[in-house]
Structures are given as C-alpha cells and as structure tokens.
Amino acid sequence: MKIQKRDGRVVPYEEDKIRKAIHKANNEVEERYRASEGLIEEILEDVQQEGRQTQTVEHIQDMIEEHLVEHNKYTLAKKYIVYRYQRSLLRKSNTTDESILKLIRNENKELAEENSNKNTRLASTQRDYIAGEVSRDVTRRLLLPEHIAMAHDNGVLHFHDADYFIQPIFNCCLINIKDMLDNGTSINGKMIESPKSFQVACTVTTQIIAAVASNQYGGQSVNIKHLGKYLRKSREKFAKQLEDEFGDTLDQAAKDKIVQMRLHDELKSGVQTIQYQINTLMTTNGQSPFVTLFLHIDENDEYVEETVQIIMEILRQRIEGTKNEKGVYVTPAFPKLVYVLDENNCLKGGKYDYVTKLAAQCSAKRMYPDYISAKKMRENYEGNVFSCMGCRSFLSPWKDENGEYKWEGRFNQGVVSINLPQIGILAKGNEEKFWKLLDERLELCYEALMCRHKALEGVVSDVSPIHWQYGAIARLKKGETIDKYLHNGYSTMSLGYIGLYEMTYLMKGCSQTVEPGKEFALRVMDYTKDRCAKWKEETGIAFSLYGTPAETLCYRFARIDREKYGDISNVTDKGYYTNSYHVDVREKIDAFTKFKIESEFQNKSLGGAISYVEVPNLTNNVEAIEEVIRFIYDNIQYGEFNTKSDYCQVCGYDGEIMINDNMEWECPQCHNKDHAKMNVTRRTCGYLGENFWNAGKTKEIKARVLHL
C-alpha cells in the first residue's frame, strides 16, 4: 500500500507512524481513556485491509477517529481531533511577522540577497518586500493547493514570484511601443499625444517603461527602431525652423550642417534621457525597471538610417558609463542591451559592420550588449526575428486574424520551475525510476502553472490601464476582461528547469558535454519540451520550455537538497546548482566549444535560453570579442560575454574586486570589504547585478573559469 502525502508525493505505507501517533494521543489522556494495544492493532489491521492501493493521509486519519468513537474512546478521539486541528491551523498560520521585522531592522539576510538589483536598506524597497512577504504567506496558506505549496517548500518545484501572486498581474512582455507612440497613450489618467520630436519620444518612452514596470513583476523590452520615426521628425522640424528663419540667405550646405549639429545634440540628449531615467527611476517594485532595449538594424524599415544613428549613440553612451555618487564612470545594470547580428552586420563585410565593431568595444568594457543571431533565430521561429521579453523569455509564434505574425503587445503569464537535480538524487542512477519521478513532477508543475493561468482569468482591464487600455498590450474598454489574451497561444506559460548539469552527473557520472551524459541530457530536454507541446495541444495555452535564470533558485534548491540528502560530491556540496542547461561553471572549456554544445540545448529551450562565455579584460583586444561574435552569428541564437567591471571607492582601484576565501568581496589593493564603498557589477543571470548576491550565487561567481 502507498500513502499520498499532502504535498502530492506518494510514499510507502509505514504503520509505525500511525502507532506512534496514537501512542502520542494516549499519553495525553488518563489511563482509563486510552486505547489498548489490541485496539491499536485492530485499527492498523483495518487500515491495511481497506483494499485501496493508495490511501491519503486524511482518509487514514478519518478511519482512526471513527474507530476510537466506535469503541467509546471519546476523550482520546477528542484529543486526536484537537491535535489534528492544531496541526492544520499551524500549516495555515501567519508566518510573516519575524521576516518582516527582520527586514525593517536590516537583519533579514535571505531577503537582502534575493535580488541583486534591489537595495533592501531603502524604505521604498522595503515597502515592496513587506508586501511581497504578505503575498507569499497568503499564497502559500490560502491560494495554492496544499500539495503544490508543500512541493514548493520541499524543493520539488519553485512557484516563481509568489510575492506578487495575490495581485492579478503577469510576468514579462514586449511593449507595443510603436502603437503607444504613434497613437498616443494615457498615464495616471493624463492623455499623452503622439510626440513631435525625438527628445519628447524618448521622455514618453521612459514614462511608459516606468508605468509598465509598476504593473507587472517581470522584464519588458522595447524595440528601439520605433524611435527612428521621431528622429526624422526632429530633423524635419529643425530644417523647417531654419527655412523659416533664414529663407534663401543661407545656402543648403550651411543649413544641412546646422540641422545635423542640432540633430546630434537632440540625439545625444534623448538617449541620455533614456539611460539616466531608467537608472534613476524607482518603480513600485522597489527597483529600476527591468528593461531591455532591442537594437535591430532592419533594412526593411523605412527609418533604418535613423535607427543606426540611435544605436550608435546608445553604444557610445554605454561605453562611457554612468557616474556613481563619487562622480566616477561605472557600468550601469540597466537598460539591458540586445544587439541583433544579421547578414548586414555580422563582421563579414556587411554594410553595418562598423556598428557591430562599436558594439564589440562596448561588450568588452561594459558587458552589454548581448547578441542575437538573426540567422539562427529565423531557423527556430518560423523565419522571424524579435526581442526576448526582458532577460531571456521568448514568445511562441502567433498570427493575427490577417495571418500576420505578431510579437509586440504580447506577454508571459508566469513561470514554474522543476528541480532536476532532486530527481537525479532520488533516482540514484536508475533510469526507470528517473522517468517515473519526472512524469509525476511534471504533472505537479502543470497544476501549478494552471494556478497562475486561472488567477488571471476574469481579470478586467482596469487593473492596469497602461497594459490593457492604453496600448502596452491592448486597447480594451474599461471593465472588459483580458481573457482572450490568455488563450489560443497569444501569451505564453513557462515550464522552467534548473541544474541539467547536476542531474546528468548524478545519472551518468559525467557532464552534458561528453557521452553518455550529453545524449541523456538531450533526451530529458526533448521529453520536457514534448510535454509542453502536449499541454499546449490539450489547453490552447502556449506552454514552452524555459531555461530558468536562477539568481536565487540556484541557492534555494541546493540548500534544500543539502539539508534533506546531505553533502553529495559535485552536486549539493558546491552550495549552488547550475543555471538551466549551462555547462558546469568550473569546467575548463573554450568559448567556441561551450557555445557549440550549449546551442543544441538552446534549440530545445525555445521558451527562454541564453548562453555566456567568461572572458578576461579585453578592452585592448577587441578583435577576440569580434571573433566570438562571428561565431555566435553562425552557431548559436543568443550569446553574451561576462567580464568584470568594478570600482573601489576607497582607493580608486578599477580592476577586478575579488571574492576571498571567506566569500567576502574584497579590493585586492586596499582590502576594502565594505559593500557601500565599492561598485561591483557581475552577470547575475541574463541581467547584470550590482547590489551583491546570495551565498550560493556568490560561490557560483567565484567558481567561474575563463573561456578565452
């Protein structure tokens, strides 16, 4: 006989546990009210002879109570019922008081290190975290089925963003910025008309970004090409002003020169507005907006030359950096820059190679931009090229009523991630057991994902006018539900995964870079991808496989499994699990081989994936970056460079600030260890982080080896 526990797990029946529970209750009452050993054995025998192959914990508890009452053991039954009720209350009791008070006193280390772009000492950020703690508590106690909540607690799966689940908001999106700029929008009840100049368009764009960020919990992306139209408007405005002012008294060459000077000033000012506004704005999420600028030189666009000018200025300003409070230029975390490589700019003699060369300089100094290969992306997404939503989440192809592909104005409903290493730990190399456990846990993930979906059903557009009424996603009427955007593949649902390396090592004794590990890991990817396709076919919801960034989860899952299963070499003893399908950060492998191997996994993880290579300071060897960029174009859809970009405010050192043997960040020159007196920027997952990291992620960062 098997027992189905409250978290959904099915475990072998152990009658000793029932015997001990009744003995515990016996000890709480006078001897005359106690159950005899004979009665206890009778209860155990009846449970065994019930005839069911699988019993629930609740059903067995009901049987015990019935037996005690039938044998007139009312006092004992009452004690057992009260005990059972108290346990139920305990599971549903408020759990937030201590964590919130510790947060306010700056003593909650776990929360402080949860997000490397949130500073928990700030009152504004604390407000978000306090709300988040309440949301987590309500979600766990009241909103999720108990077995899903238990599965989350036990590290079977991770129900992402529970700190926002009580609100009817979604994860990430591609803003339909073209519609909002061209047709106007409304923010905070104030109409914003279509801009008449580039500077105003940049200002409005940052206002839209802030409003969108405050009404969702994940990242967002803006295709910068839609600003090209407004740069041309500024050029036309300046030309008309000169014509009105000087008429024929100035020759055309002089007029063109003045127009170009004024346009350059406006271009610089507009881009500066975007960079500084995004890095200084504080959303209701207690942080700068998680936003990506998509830099795509699309020659089919009539404003392509204006787009090139904007991209060049964005890259120039990013190379310069932003000033910290000491007035020193440092690497900003936002906005994330994603640059598209195509036939016209892939460093093979294309028309726009000069833009890519500037992008390479920028990556060498500031880590961004990251690179998308249009060539590989078209192979994966029915000939289309489009931005990720924020860090790495990609939409599935969808066509409107006219048969046209649509990307902007779509979104992701949410993410649930599966703990692959835990399955490997429990399977102990037995493939039959592995696939059985994977099946069971995928069904739990599906149920958890449907909780997210159902939480959005019936939501009306009024909850976020910027999204639903004024163009970021749609132009619905007030009071209209958002339901039509939740079905038929318009928006996506993500099944995330973490620790493919650890899972492979546990099952095959090697990494996924060699056989038999690689074949097994790819089979697991195919299996989970196919399961997403099956769910999509059954529900009409666009489920997709997503390589989880795992900023916090890399530590959380590893910590849970270490507590449950002890130190396991190369798995739990490291203190972290590896991001998604990535090669073990400690493995000595060159950049080209790493990208080549990981590209096979990227192609199966089309709901979200990004690969990186760790490089030294290459500001004096940009040609090495360019060589890898050429390789990215032909071999992998989405790649990025990790380098170091640090500054010690005590001594002025601007080399790499190291992690010492005590896992402390320390300036190698003056030995400063004060986080408040140093600027450290590292690749956290797909985004950069600059507010330091949890213990697991810090260990992972320290363990990274160079690939060039």
Regions found by a protein language model. Give the residues of each.
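Charged, amphipathic alpha-helical regulatory modules used
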Residues: M1-E107, K702-H707
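Buried hydrophobic packing segments
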Residues: I18, I22, L227, L231, ...
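Conserved catalytic cores of very large enzyme subunits
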Residues: Q86-L90, T96-G489, C510, V514-K673, ...
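Long insertion/accessory domains within large nucleic-acid-processing enzymes
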Residues: H671-L708
